[in-house]
Structure formats: C-alpha cells, structure tokens
C-alpha cells in the first residue's frame, strides 16, 4: 500500500521532495503528469509532478484532483500537496484553491501549511515566512515576475485565497514537543480554524511536525516536512 502520495505543483519541487523522501529512507518514484497505469512496484511513496503553480486556478484544481483520484486508487494513506517553500501564489491561488479542493475530496475539514525548509534558509516564525533571514516580502521574491510576494504573513496570504480561517502553531509550542503540538492543533480545529501554519526554525521542528501529522489524510507544504514524515 502506498504510504505517501505527493501532488507537486512543478517539476523542480517534485524532484526536490522525492530526493528528501529517498534520503530519509522511503523508496520513492517520481512520475511526470497524472499517471494512467498502476503504482510502480517497490515504492512507499509516489511523487506526481504537475505544472500547476501559475496556471489558472480551475486548471490547477482539475489536474490536482485527477492526480488525487489515481492516488486513491492505489490505496494511498496520506496525500501531500507540495508547493514552493516561498509560498509562490497570488490572491487568486493556486495554493488556497487546490488545498480547498483536496480537502473536500478527502472529506477533511482541517489541514496544515508548512512551507519551511531551514536547510535552504526558509524558516517560519510566528507565522511569518523568512528567506535567508529576510522577511519574504523583503526578499527577492517581492519582485517575482509572475507571483510577486509582497506580504510575509502566511495566515493572511492563505486566507486571501482560501475558504476559511488560518491560525498559527508557534515555534514555542513545537519546542514543547509532540503532545503539546498535537493539542494546539486540536484546539485550533475546535475553534473553527480550517488551516494551521506551522512554525519551523530547524529540522527538529520538522521532525515533530512529522510525528504529529503521520496519520492525517492531507498535509501541505514545501519539501521540509517530508523529512519528518518519511
């Protein structure tokens, strides 16, 4: 049975997360575009590489749901929507719309936002995304030709393009460990939040995230979270 099925919004990101999964001990196969055959033998994870980062939101949703259908046919235990660690998107999407569509299809009312990749200088603190110690909106991403990032606060970025409230699990909670992090996520869900941004300043934070999230149907983020889940 397939343990993790990754739906990646571009080829480079797909290759990135596939390498992280393999390096952390999970046999992984990367497939370009929505698969048509059966699951390759001998793998615990499949990474589906799409081209949905900057296409129209409805097309991104269509392709992502098609990938999800295939993953479900393979008995996939957990779906991982992978996007860039700089949260490349606009108020129109595509991170929010695709996340919402996957949540509906998987019948889940809550998921996480975890773009951090500390090894590459992408960290999240108090819900703010940093690139090499600079706030996202003060990095080179501010002048991105397709998806200029002029805000650094991930809950605000997510709420602008999605269908619910977004909270934050701060680094201090992650420092307290798995039980505290799990309890904090549960509280946000009970309070009606639909998404939770997870702080991460180091790999230990990602490991804790992975332990907490190992059995949930859907996670979203960059490649870093794969370290904890593999």
Say what each PLM segment does.
Residues 1-2, 60, 68-206:
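Cap/lid and interdomain-hinge subdomains that line or gate substrate/regulatory clefts
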Residues 2-41, 62-64, 114-119:
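N-terminal basic/disordered segments at the start of proteins
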Residues 13-17, 205-206, 228:
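Short glycine/serine/threonine-rich phosphate/pyrophosphate-binding segments
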Residues 14, 28, 66, 72, ...:
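Hydrophobic alpha/beta core scaffold segments
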Residues 22, 72, 213:
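Anion (oxyanion) recognition and catalysis
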Residues 45-64:
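Short, structured active-site "lid" loops
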Residues 213-230:
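Acidic, glycine-rich loop-and-beta core segments that form the ion-binding/anion-interacting portion
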């Amino acid at each position: 049975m397939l343990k993790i099925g990754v739906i990646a919004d571009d080829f480079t990101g797909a290759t990135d997360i596939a390498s992280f999964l393999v390096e952390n001990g999970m046999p992984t196969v990367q497939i370009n575009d929505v698969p048509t055959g059966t699951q390759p033998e001998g793998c615990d994870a499949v990474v589906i590489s799409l081209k949905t980062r900057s296409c129209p939101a409805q097309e991104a949703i269509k392709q992502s749901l098609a990938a999800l259908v295939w993953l479900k046919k393979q008995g996939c235990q957990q779906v991982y929507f992978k996007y860039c660690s700089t949260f490349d998107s606009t108020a129109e999407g595509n991170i929010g719309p695709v996340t919402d569509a996957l949540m509906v299809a998987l019948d889940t009312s809550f998921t996480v936002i975890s773009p951090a990749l500390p090894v590459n200088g992408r960290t999240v603190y108090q819900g703010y995304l940093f690139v090499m110690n600079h706030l996202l909106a003060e990095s080179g991403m501010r002048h991105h030709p397709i998806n200029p990032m002029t805000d650094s606060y991930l809950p605000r970025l997510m709420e602008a393009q999605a269908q619910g409230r977004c909270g934050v699990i701060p680094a201090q909670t992650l420092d307290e460990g798995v039980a505290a992090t799990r309890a904090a996520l549960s509280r946000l869900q009970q309070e009606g939040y639909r998404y939770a941004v997870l702080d991460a300043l180091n790999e230990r934070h990602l490991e804790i995230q992975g332990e907490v999230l190992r059995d949930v149907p859907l996670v979203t983020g960059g490649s870093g979270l794969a370290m904890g889940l593999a």
